[in-house]
């Protein structure tokens, strides 16, 4: 068992090594005289007078002679008394001042003197600590022969005593210091010479107790042992038994901590302005994404991609386990069992009405508090369930007044009708009633002919206040029974216009039951995915590409063939009515020659249990869908079942495939965590958490070709992370400098602008902003549309010339990405108020996108000539050939929009050529 002195020895070892080299190795006589002078000085300070001093002077020479004689006798002793030597060695470890010689009659006197000196040293420790240390140090070196014998004796008995490791007399200072500390552990009255004690037998100790010679005078030494002098004498430990194991070595020294950075360096790093334009050499090649991927992205084969084998292997349901750590039991129980229903004080479960009535929502404008059960009637029209859920979480009330302008110019009035507000209020109910009548009349139009059509038009014009002389409100010849497009432009925008001749070529209404929250085109532009409130993902295929995708589906989905070990959810999904799109293209209405899509979905994917919020396509036709059921599901166009389900802790608001490696995808959730998933490994590769008071991720995407991951938050922040390690890089606070919107509002969409290091950010302050990532500056602000509470997001056209967005005022808004200075004499280069509006819906336009390849959606006559070889394609890479480059098709744009009722409209616009 280690004592206090052993613990101190470990920490003091470095000092002993340093001090041990300074001991002088002199002659035995010189060392002895110095020790006696030290004893004399100490005795004089303690008050010991002349009787003791005379006795010391008479005995000093005898002690020196006895030491020399004893050293000669040591060599002749036999090893017949090992036990007595072991005991003597244990006592030697606790010995005090040296006493040697064969005249044992003087030893009792010396013991008495040393006892007084020990008491005096405790009273005046600060005066004689140096003297005692030198005396104890020199006692270990009485003569050369004695030292050699002492070392030999220690080596023989090191397995019998705990202190044997400290008795090996070495010239180095470490062994000397160890011996000095052990020598301080003295039993009171036991003062034995460590050098001569090795030669004493058991019968010698009785004689030692009878003799008490006077202690010779000591001399001061100029080099005291400072470390040993600081040790106070403690009671000696009893000798260990014979079979006691050797002592354990001291523990290794602790490693030094890394050097801390200076305060000035930390302040300098904090003041550095982050820049997103980091050279590619900074990315290591042994990490998740290598640098050479960016240089080889033109070669499709060199890029890693996701295949069906890796997507279907492993678990079908993956939980959000960050870095291999399983979530806690409460989290797993919450995901499996769902949230627990609140209970009353008596233990009864509350009903839905009671729960809604217990939640209060405050109107920040009026200060009025209303229960959530009544708030739905007073909420803005077209509010989506995600916004309603966030309002419950944040206890906020979204006001229509939040769309007011924060700039010097006021927003143009959102009233699109020419009559006053009173007249509009009176005709609101009439619109709803006559809207149904218009639909009935359209179905009867074929029977009653042109007269019925004219009557329907007159009723429609009366309800919607359209001008019959307006060319934009007239029906198109090739599109019978399609409601025309109403066009408008900004007040100060006098033309020429680019979208005043836009036409509706197809109406895909009737499939979605409820609002359509998101729409996404595949990279090739031949498939459209739409999803929303009815929990179903629908895939729409172009007419001229239907045969190709149908053959692909039939190839992988023969009779009874599905993915290996499908989950229960995928089994129910595989039973969905995906075979409804197997019918050939001849079943389509022959009158809809200008319609680019088949009127019925190519397939439907069922499996989600709540509203779908976002979609994402990969280059090889994998599709991700995120939902308010806290899951992300993976699909493939050739399969009918769900390939994998990635579970989250909260609503998944945004997802995005990695643009260069579709084995990974990004997901943002309302739990405040950004996750980078590895699809083949079925786990979370990297993750990070948003800091701040409001940890709600509402948008997410990649920028700079996957170099950075960027997310949008509920409080108006765009936070950038490097994709390689998903570490924080920088952030932008999306807000106005003054006015109502100086506080950041919810980010609803983030779109990169390739080739220019810019991103397009949509927010709930009815603004769209274009930021330059090189210096995080605002390049352009677009306004004119209304987006106060919806998840509406803006997107670019196929050639990035225009951007489009839906709006809560039932219009589709289009802006030029940059100002055409030939149209304007004086205009702010960082403001774009010159929008063009299109109205073709009767409800909030929740989504609006441009087609990535408009050349595929021209009339069937032209397409049959350009794409007659589509059935000869062997793989999907050929279909993607046109998506790699920008196709300029004689100023033609294809636009799609969806609304709150589930209607989907397809527009084609042919711009006027300026000669």
Curated annotation (Swiss-Prot):
InterPro entries, per database record: G-protein_beta_WD-40_rep, WD40/YVTN_repeat-like_dom_sf, WD40_repeat_dom_sf, WD40_rpt, WDR44/Dgr2
Subcellular locations according to the entry: Cytoplasm, Cytosol; Cytoplasm, Perinuclear region; Endosome membrane; Golgi apparatus, trans-Golgi network
GO biological process, alphabetically ordered: cytosolic ciliogenesis; negative regulation of cilium assembly; regulation of vesicle-mediated transport
GO CC annotations, alphabetized: cytosol; endosome membrane; Golgi apparatus; perinuclear region of cytoplasm
Ranges where the record places region Disordered: 1-24, 79-102, 117-174, 208-282, 399-425, 461-481, 559-593
Bias type Basic and acidic residues, positions: 146-155, 264-280
Superkingdom of source: Eukaryota
WD repeat locations: 511-550, 607-645, 647-687, 692-731, 742-781, 786-825, 840-880, 882-915
Coiled coil: 114-139
Signal peptide: none
Record remark: domains: The FFAT-like motif is important for interaction with VAPA or VAPB.
Phosphotyrosine carried by residues: 11, 481
Name the record gives this protein: WD repeat-containing protein 44
Functional description taken from the UniProt entry: Downstream effector for Rab11 which regulates Rab11 intracellular membrane trafficking functions such as endocytic recycling, intracellular ciliogenesis and protein export. ATK1-mediated phosphorylation of WDR44 induces binding to Rab11 which activates endocytic recycling of transferrin receptor back to the plasma membrane. When bound to Rab11, prevents the formation of the ciliogenic Rab11-Rabin8/RAB3IP-RAB11FIP3 complex, therefore inhibiting preciliary trafficking and ciliogenesis.
Composition-biased stretches (Low complexity): 563-575
Pro residues composition-biased segments: 235-258
Chain segments carrying region Binding activity: 2-173
Pfam families named in the record: WD40 (PF00400)
N-acetylalanine modification, residue list: 2
Region of interest (Important for interaction with ARHGAP26 AND ARHGAP10), residue spans: 213-259
Residues bearing the modification Phosphoserine: 3, 27, 50, 66, 71, 81, 126, 264, 344, 346, 405, 472-474, 563, 567
